[in-house]
Amino acid sequence: MAKKSKIAKERKREELVNKYYELRKELKAKGDYETLRKLPRDSSPTRLTRRCKVTGRPRGVLRKFEMSRIAFREHAHKGQIPGVKKSSW
């Protein structure tokens, strides 16, 4: 499980990205890079990291399920993810 402070920091970044999304889009269209540079750094979507929705782990996250590989494996074995089953051939 990730530290609660790291998860909270990431959530705060997501809020800032959503808040400044339209303004950033307009400034980029105008080419006003000076004003764009003055916006908060955390309002840039490139600073976001995908985290596991279950554990908060930042690495090894499967985009489709928004889970880390470890949490995905546990939930898949228990049958808690619809449409996913262990393959065998």
From Swiss-Prot:
Taxonomy, superkingdom = Bacteria
Give one GO term, molecular function aspect.
rRNA binding
For this UniProt record, the keywords arranged alphabetically read as follows: Ribonucleoprotein, Ribosomal protein, RNA-binding, rRNA-binding
Cite the InterPro entries for this sequence. Answer: Ribosomal_uS14, Ribosomal_uS14_bac/plastid, Ribosomal_uS14_CS, Ribosomal_uS14_sf
Q: Name one Pfam family in it.
A: Ribosomal_S14
Q: Name one GO biological process term.
A: translation
One GO cellular component term noted in the UniProt record for this chain? small ribosomal subunit
Family, as annotated: Belongs to the universal ribosomal protein uS14 family.
Summarize the subunit comment: Part of the 30S ribosomal subunit. Contacts proteins S3 and S10.
What is this protein for, i.e. what is its function?
A: Binds 16S rRNA, required for the assembly of 30S particles and may also be responsible for determining the conformation of the 16S rRNA at the A site.
The protein depicted here goes by the name: Small ribosomal subunit protein uS14A
**Organism, as annotated:** Staphylococcus aureus (strain MRSA252)
